[in-house]
Structure formats: structure tokens, C-alpha cells
Curated annotation (Swiss-Prot):
InterPro entries: Chromosome_partition_MukF (IPR005582), MukF_C (IPR033441), MukF_C_sf (IPR038198), MukF_M (IPR033440), MukF_M_sp (IPR036141), MukF_WHTH (IPR033439), WH-like_DNA-bd_sf (IPR036388), WH_DNA-bd_sf (IPR036390). Interacts, and probably forms a ternary complex, with MukE and MukB via its C-terminal region. The complex formation is stimulated by calcium or magnesium. It is required for an interaction between MukE and MukB. Gene3D superfamilies: Chromosome partition protein MukF, middle domain (1.20.58.590), MukF, C-terminal domain (1.10.225.40), Winged helix-like DNA-binding domain superfamily/Winged helix DNA-binding domain (1.10.10.10). This is Chromosome partition protein MukF. The keyword Cell cycle applies.
Length: 445
């Protein structure tokens, strides 16, 4: 919020309304009138003194009228009416010069400059512009700190410190804030472009959407990095001046100015991170929409468009890109049961020098007991039970390698009928650390 807005906000609303009514302020800019005002601004920027004669305004009006041919011809009468409307609305100021034999000259008013700046000068919020503005702020703050360290009379503080903080640093902060609002509008424009792409051409929409999303994300990230790097230095400079004026009642107006700058700096910095967070959320939303619409295609909209594209191929040729991934092998096939190779892996230190036959005999004894129970009671052999009992006797760090040995021996001793029926087994825990095994019970041996 600028200083002018702050001063206006402190006044009662009825006084402000009376002031507007007293001066008969009003704005009525049609598209044609706005284009005329922008044309005047462009021509003014090309002039050293930014002054235009009446003939130049007529030329600008003729250029605009050619593009708005439905409104009528570019007559001198219509041009004068348009100029008089601009003067009445305090958008341009008219001066009569004796040097030019009474001919009028025109200049843009501050209101017109503010309007045209929005449409002409602030359409691009770049990292370079932001860096320059932040550099200017740092230089002005350095001047204010130097003046504050020297000290002096209240007049010295008013001129050399307060004046810089309020009219130099504060206005640059307001300009950065305005540029950030322009960036907000650019984001809305990108969102509209993405929406139009998704509604118009599905085949081209995905790549274009990705480019727009990536470009905007990169821009926001660069701007935020620039803001973050500069804000730390500015924060330090504000604190340095606050430390100098702290406790001095005669310099309370300096503290108030610093407080206002602190609020503006916080708002500028927080805007960058908030803009990134909001854009990340929108980015995810768009990607989720694309995945849902294309992968799921519940309403068959994409399918119908594809069929139509195939039908219109000879009128509008296109290329088809497809992916042919390798098939996944089923590990529970006949080869797994009948294979005779050993599972390799690092052997734990405790069993590195242990005879493999000893490990095999121990496993065979356990499985033999279970086979006997299976023979006597018809109970299947559950590999998860064998693994859980055996691994419980060894350290956690050895479980993986030992489990491989157990599985290797188990598949040699028997197999499961369910493997041949393509039955998917459940995952079962084999230790207390989250390890699980997925294997059908052995019921054939």
C-alpha cells in the first residue's frame, strides 16, 4: 500500500466521497478510448519533452479509428470530441502556448500515466528488472544508514534519513509490489492458455501445457531466489537504523517509517514463496487432470477423438508414437521348481566358514519334521513358518542372506500345486523388522 493510499485511508469515508463529488471525478473508457489513450502514451514516450500537439493527437486518433472502423470515420469533429473527453476526465492536460500562436499542447496526467503504464510498461516482470530494483533499494538504504550514523539535528534526520526511507525506498517497494501483481495476472493468463489448450487440441495440449508449467515454475523460482537473497541484506539494514534511533522520542517518525518498510518487505518476500506454493498446487492439479482424462478416459472422450483423427487421417495426417515394453517374467513358473542352480549372495560372517552341508542338514531336519506332520495330518508346509523360526536364531543383519539359502533349499525339496494354477499367494511376515515373503505352501514333494 503506497503512502498516498495510507493517507487517504486515514480520512473518513464521507470526506473522501465529498471530495470526489466536489471535483466531479469520473472515468468512462471504452475499448476505443483506451486504445486512443495508449496510442497517445506511446507517441509521448517518443518525444523528448513528452508533449504532443493537436495535430499529432488527430493522427493518433486516425490510427485507432482505422482498427475500429465500425465506430465511424476519423473526422476532425470526432477527434476533438475524444480529446475533450480525455481533458474532462483529467487524463490529459491542455496548455495554450503563445510561442505556437495560441495552438494547444497536451501532456498525459498522472492518472493517465498510471493507466497506460499498466498496459504498456508493466507487462513483463523479469528477474533483471527485479534485481535492478532491489539493487537500487540497497543503495538508498546504505545512504540512509550512513546519514543515520552521522546523526545531527531533527532537520538532518528529516531530510537525509526520513526522506530517503519514505520517498525513495518506499516508492521502489511499491513499484516491486506492483510488478508482483502484474506477475499474478501473468499466471492467470498462463492458466487460461492451458485451459484453452486442454479444451481445443488434446494431441498438442500435453507438450504445450508442460512447457507453460515448466517455464512459469522456473520464472517463479528464479524471482524467489533473487528476492530471498536481497531481503536478508535489506532486513539487516532496517535493523541497523532501528538500533540507532531506538529509545529517542524525537526520532519516533523514523521508527514509524521503518515499521512501514518492514511490512512492505515482509509482504514482498512472502509473496514469492506463496506464489510458488500456489503454482505447485496448480501444477499438480493439471497433471492429475491429464492423467485422469487420458489414462482413465471414463467418458471415452479421448477415444472418440482418436477415432475421429483416424477417420480424418488423409485430410489431416498425424504421427502415432507408442511404447512396447518387455513383458515381465513370472517367477513362479515350472522353471523355478525344477531349476538346480544355487542362489548366490554374501554369506554372513557367522556361517562363512560353516560347512554348507551342516546348514542343509539342519534345514532338512526341520522340513522333514514338517513333512512328517503333513503326512500324518495332511497339513501343508508353510515356508513363512520355516523362515520365521530359523531367522529368529540369527542377527537381523544376516536375515537377507539366510533367507535366500532357506528358499533355495526349500524349492529343491518340494513344490506347491498352487504354483501351477497361477494362484497369487499372500505376503507373510518372517521377522519383526518388516520383512515378508510371498510363497504358496508346499504340498507336493
Amino acid at each position: 500500500m503506497s503512502e498516498m493510499t495510507l493517507n487517504a485511508a486515514e480520512q473518513p469515508i464521507d470526506e473522501l466521497v465529498g471530495w470526489v463529488k466536489q471535483h466531479d471525478f469520473s472515468l468512462n473508457l471504452t475499448t476505443e478510448r483506451l486504445a486512443f489513450l495508449i496510442a497517445i502514451a506511446v507517441l509521448s514516450n517518443e518525444r523528448f519533452d513528452e508533449e504532443l500537439g493537436e495535430g499529432e493527437l488527430h493522427d493518433a486518433f486516425a490510427i485507432v479509428t482505422r482498427l475500429f472502423d465500425e465506430t465511424g470515420e476519423a473526422s476532425a469533429f470526432r477527434a476533438n470530441n475524444a480529446i475533450n473527453e480525455m481533458v474532462k476526465q483529467r487524463l490529459i492536460s491542455r496548455f495554450v502556448s503563445e510561442i505556437t500562436d495560441g495552438a494547444s499542447i497536451y501532456r498525459l496526467s498522472p492518472l493517465a500515466i498510471g493507466i497506460t503504464d499498466y498496459y504498456v510498461r508493466h507487462r513483463e516482470f523479469s528477474k533483471l528488472r527485479l534485481s535492478i530494483q532491489l539493487s537500487m533499494v540497497a543503495d538508498e538504504m546504505a545512504k540512509a544508514i550512513e546519514a543515520a550514523q552521522k546523526g545531527g539535528t531533527p532537520g538532518h534526520w528529516k531530510k537525509n534519513v526520513y526522506g530517503i526511507l519514505k520517498y525513495s525506498v518506499g516508492e521502489i517497494f511499491d513499484q516491486i509490489d506492483l510488478n508482483q501483481r502484474v506477475m499474478d495476472e501473468q499466471q492467470q493468463s498462463v492458466k487460461q492458455q492451458i485451459a484453452d489448450l486442454l479444451n481445443k487440441d488434446w494431441r498438442e495440449a500435453i507438450n504445450n501445457c508442460e512447457a507453460l508449467l515448466s517455464e512459469t515454475s522456473s520464472t517463479l523460482r528464479e524471482l524467489q531466489d533473487t528476492l530471498q537473497a536481497a531481503s536478508d541484506e535489506l532486513q539487516t539494514q532496517i535493523l541497523d537504523i532501528q538500533e540507532i534511533v531506538y529509545g529517542d522520542p524525537e526520532l519516533e517518525f523514523i521508527e514509524e517509517a521503518l515499521f512501514g518498510l518492514q511490512m512492505k518487505l515482509d509482504r514482498i518476500t512472502s509473496w514469492g514463496q506463496q506464489a510458488i506454493d500456489l503454482w505447485i498446487g496448480y501444477d499438480r492439479h493439471v497433471h492429475k487432470f491429464i492423467r485422469t482424462a487420458i489414462d482413465m478416459d471414463k467418458n471415452r472422450a479421448f477415444s472418440s477423438r482418436l477415432r475421429q483423427s483416424v477417420k480424418d487421417y488423409f485430410d489431416s495426417p498425424w504421427y502415432l508414437t507408442y511404447a512396447d515394453a518387455e513383458r515381465l517374467s513370472d517367477l513362479r513358473d515350472e522353471a523355478l521348481v525344477l531349476r538346480d542352480d544355487e542362489v548366490t549372495g554374501q554369506v554372513p560372517m557367522e556361517v562363512e566358514y560353516e560347512e554348507f552341508q551342516q546348514v542343509n542338514d539342519e534345514l532338512a531336519e526341520r522340513i522333514g519334521d514338517m513333512l512328517k506332520a503333513h503326512k500324518d495330518q495332511g497339513a501343508p508346509i508353510d515356508l513363512s513358518v520355516v523362515l520365521r523360526d530359523y531367522l529368529a536364531q540369527h542377527p537381523h543383519t544376516h536375515h537377507f542372506d539366510l533367507a535366500r539359502i532357506v528358499v533355495d533349499q526349500a524349492v529343491r525339496l518340494g513344490y506347491s500345486e498352487s504354483d501351477y494354477q497361477a494362484v497369487q499367494p499372500d505376503w507373510k511376515a518372517i521377522n519383526e523388522f518388516g520383512a515378508k515373503v510371498q510363497a504358496n505352501v508346499i504340498d507336493r514333494y
